């Protein structure tokens, strides 16, 4: 079970949004590389990074900040935002990104996901961000007419490493993860699922470690870590104890 600390990038800074709204961004660190180092020092094992500007632009927009992070941490980094063609995927993987996350392109160009997953086994994940059950695209600015399960099932045999499922309504609001929807998705497919959006407290970590959530690979923690509502030492100790049991 992995707890991924999140770094969302906007204008080269580390921010958190509320419900994916770029107008509701709070800057938490002017130096994303320093934030990445802080997470590494706290004992986290895997970093989750999103290029928010890239998600809206459809191409990488915070490459300098991402590359700076890669230089200062040794833990694996998964990256999403603006990754919509094979050339961009190849470029990021060659620079040291452990796993790329394809979001909008997974809805609009599923063949890209299948091609990339075949070319780079274990290094391609799909990000499914749902609003009222349907997947949103273009940095969450547009809603599609397909459900997360519809999309996920397209990639059952494609070799996708993970599905990162976000409930947009809860993202950045500290209301707790939508466990019902996330676990239902995980139980309906064979691809590992990572929970995202709304992780609020140590109680969410306990749920993550419960038998109910046994099909989940992990969860992403954002605002709760920055606000101090989730103590990283306590959370990682809980996960460590569960692994040792």
From Swiss-Prot:
One of its GO terms (biological process) is L-histidine biosynthetic process. It comes from Rhodopseudomonas palustris (strain TIE-1). The keyword Secreted does not apply. The gene is hisA. It catalyses: 1-(5-phospho-beta-D-ribosyl)-5-[(5-phospho-beta-D-ribosylamino)methylideneamino]imidazole-4-carboxamide = 5-[(5-phospho-1-deoxy-D-ribulos-1-ylimino)methylamino]-1-(5-phospho-beta-D-ribosyl)imidazole-4-carboxamide. Belongs to the HisA/HisF family. SUPFAM superfamilies: Ribulose-phoshate binding barrel. It is found in: Cytoplasm. This is 1-(5-phosphoribosyl)-5-[(5-phosphoribosylamino)methylideneamino] imidazole-4-carboxamide isomerase. Its EC number is 5.3.1.16. The keyword Secreted does not apply.
């Amino acid at each position: 079970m992995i707890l991924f600390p999140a770094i969302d990038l906007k204008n080269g800074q580390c921010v958190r949004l509320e419900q994916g709204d770029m107008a509701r961004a709070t800057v938490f660190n002017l130096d994303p590389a320093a934030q990445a180092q802080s997470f590494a020092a706290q004992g986290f094992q895997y970093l989750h990074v999103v290029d928010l500007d890239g998600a809206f632009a459809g191409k990488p927009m915070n490459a300098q900040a991402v590359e700076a992070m890669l230089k200062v941490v040794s833990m694996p980094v998964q990256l999403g935002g603006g990754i919509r063609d094979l050339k961009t995927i190849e470029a990021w993987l060659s620079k040291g990104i452990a796993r790329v996350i394809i979001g909008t392109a997974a809805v609009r160009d599923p063949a890209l996901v299948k091609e990339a997953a075949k070319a780079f086994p274990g290094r391609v994940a799909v990000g499914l961000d749902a609003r009222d059950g349907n997947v949103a695209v273009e940095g969450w600015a547009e809603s599609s007419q397909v459900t997360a399960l519809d999309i996920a099932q397209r990639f059952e045999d494609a070799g996708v490493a993970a599905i990162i499922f976000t409930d947009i309504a809860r993202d950045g609001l500290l209301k707790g993860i939508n466990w019902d929807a996330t676990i239902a998705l995980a139980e309906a497919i064979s691809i590992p699922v990572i929970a995202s959006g709304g992780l609020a407290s140590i109680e969410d970590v306990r749920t993550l470690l419960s038998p109910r959530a046994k099909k989940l690979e992990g969860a992403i923690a954002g605002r709760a870590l920055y606000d101090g509502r989730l103590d990283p030492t306590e959370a990682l100790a809980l996960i460590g104890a569960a692994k040792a049991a």
